[in-house]
Amino acid sequence: PTGWQQDSAVVRFSGGTDTGTSLPDWSAAPGDYGSGIHHYEYSINGGAWTGCPVGDPTVTITAGGETTVTARVVDGAGNASGQTATAKVYIDPAPPNVPGITLSTEQWTNSTVTVAIKDNGDAHSGVARTEYSLDGGSWTTYSDVLSIADHGKHTVSARAIDNVGRISGTASKTALVDKVAPVISKVEQQPDSGHTEMTLAVTATDADSGV
């Protein structure tokens, strides 16, 4: 549903006339017939009725999820209106779950690494979008699988944003791409051991995935 709020919502009661059948309409000025409107009463999710003075006809809803507020008017003689008015309030008190990141490989590779990001839901208003950041750069809306082909270590971060603007925690993974061959720094012939085979000692280094 639409109309989600972040932390709380204030429901204001108004309207109603003392005819025995009128109901609050949430907008009209209170009427004053018969013994007059004494106060409003409201019920939360079908619970007990609670009084609410005309001078401060509000109730604040903070419970997460959907809350149904039902209201009626009570006159000076204690008669409650035969009809009621109902409103639904939607509160999202928490950020979405942290999204998941899947790499095509989490080991060193000389090929392109693909990155898939999946939101893990939101308990209330729902996930509006997921975003990613590469190597600490700006956040970008995620729409399709990412490809990382450049040499080196690359940090992929992801977060989710729900429909009231709350931001999840951040997930991160590192893509490891090594496209540089090892460097041979020295080749030595081992001392002649009297065998017919020659032995060579090779010293090589690789700054990324290693030799």
Residue ranges and their predicted role:
Residues 1-211:
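Low-complexity, disordered linker/stalk regions enriched in Pro/Thr/Ser/Gly
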